[in-house]
Amino acid sequence: MSQSTAYIILNILVILAGCFITACGIYLFVNGLFHSIIGFVLGIYYLLAGVCIVLLEIVFPQKLVNLFGFYTYWFGKGALISLIGLLILGNSGFFLAAGIIVIAVGIVCMIFHFLLGCPRPLINRSVERKPEPQGQHA
């Protein structure tokens, strides 16, 4: 398998994980609206996180590279996805399955950090991480 094929497969896996996170967010948002404020807030959190993961996987604007530098590495991407997967884990079948799938995708990303270079978004594959200038502090 070539390196570009591995990038595309991992991008698709991360998009799948983002879709699971979004689905959990929609479910919790709708149910939490009437039952508990915690479910409502977690639903919004999962919804925003899932949509952002999917969008950043498709296109990663250059302006966001310095703000989300950890997301330009497979390990940072995998750690974020695994953390969200741990939060999703629940007693019901859907949340348990979604949490396990999301955690597995995160672990795969962290493993591939040591085997592949930096990830690229699906559409604008020319985005590269720019090093910060030395000697300038905000």
From Swiss-Prot:
Alphabetic keyword roster: Membrane, Transmembrane, Transmembrane helix
Organism superkingdom: Eukaryota
Keyword hit for Repressor: no
Induction, as annotated: Developmentally regulated, is also induced by heat shock and cold shock.
A Gene Ontology biological process term: vesicle-mediated transport
GO cellular component, one term: Golgi membrane
Membrane topology according to the record: Multi-pass membrane protein
Localisation per UniProt entry: Membrane
Residue intervals passing through the bilayer: 12-30, 32-56, 71-90, 93-118
Protein name from the UniProt record: Membrane protein P8A7
